[in-house]
A protein has these predicted regions:
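Active-site-proximal beta-alpha core segment in soluble small-molecule metabolic enzymes
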Residues: 1-57, 66, 87, 92
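Short glycine- and Lys/Arg-enriched binding-loop motifs that mark or flank ligand-binding interfaces
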Residues: 14, 20, 57-61, 103, ...
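Active-site beta-loop-alpha junctions enriched in small/polar residues
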Residues: 21-28, 58-65, 107-109, 137-139, ...
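Charged (often Lys/Glu-rich) extended helix/loop segments that serve as interaction or gating elements
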Residues: 97-186
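Active-site glycine- and acidic-residue-rich loops that bind
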Residues: 1-3, 26-39, 79, 108-113, ...
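Acidic/histidine-enriched ion/cofactor-binding microenvironments in catalytic or ligand-binding pockets
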Residues: 47-49, 53-56, 75, 79-82, ...
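Short, surface-exposed linear patches
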Residues: 1, 39-44, 80-83, 124-127, ...
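Short glycine/threonine-rich loop-to-helix capping motif typified by GTGT followed
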Residues: 29-36, 67-80, 111-125, 181-185
Length: 186
């Protein structure tokens, strides 16, 4: 279908083409991005050989993840870049596609480690669970409420010491306004 779509678009007068993919989000492996590049570069060669279109760019999208949990190893962007460069040289250059621009969308990778949400505990409630209420909410950090994303929480007043399992909840009257569920914290 993709080859046919390129052919039909070329027949309609489109002159500049590109390939863009979004296959994963927040991968924490140095191997993912070079493998994605290999697949897209091979696809690009196939498209150009079968359609004769001028391919101007390949967008590898995002996907290079960050270590949200302290025990996770961070991605090494130099290793990732070397891997992409290797497959570029092995696949695109021999096919005469060394001119193709390579784009990325690495916003999370570049910025995630620079953002913090600082909030205060406003109350603690014990029922069938222990809830720690804070003066922030999903309005300030939507990812945990929206799809359960993990964000590390540090108790700046007492980073060490006895811990307890708690839910850290926001100030909204919504059952999913939670920054952490059943998290062991000091």
């Amino acid at each position: 279908q993709l080859i046919q779509a390129f052919i039909e678009l070329k027949e309609l007068g489109v002159e500049e083409f590109g390939i863009h993919a979004l296959l994963a989000s927040n991968t924490v492996s140095n191997d993912y991005y070079p493998e994605l590049a290999r697949q897209l570069f091979e696809l690009a060669v196939e498209v150009v050989e079968n359609t004769g279109v001028h391919l101007g760019f390949i967008n590898l999208s995002g996907g290079v993840g960050v270590n949200y949990k302290p025990e996770q190893e961070p991605n090494d962007i130099a290793i990732i870049g070397e891997g992409v460069h290797r497959v570029f040289d092995a696949i695109l250059k021999p096919a005469g596609l060394g001119h193709v621009k390579i784009y990325t969308e690495l916003g999370r990778f570049m910025l995630a480690s620079h953002g913090l949400l600082v909030t205060r505990v406003t109350h603690k409630k014990k029922t069938y669970r222990t809830y720690v209420g804070v003066d922030a909410s999903a309005v300030n950090l939507l990812r945990p409420a929206m799809y359960g994303a993990y964000h590390h929480i540090t108790n700046m007043d007492r980073p060490e010491g006895p811990t307890e399992v708690v839910d850290v909840v926001g100030s909204l009257c919504e059952n999913n306004d939670k920054f952490a569920k059943q998290r062991e914290l000091p």
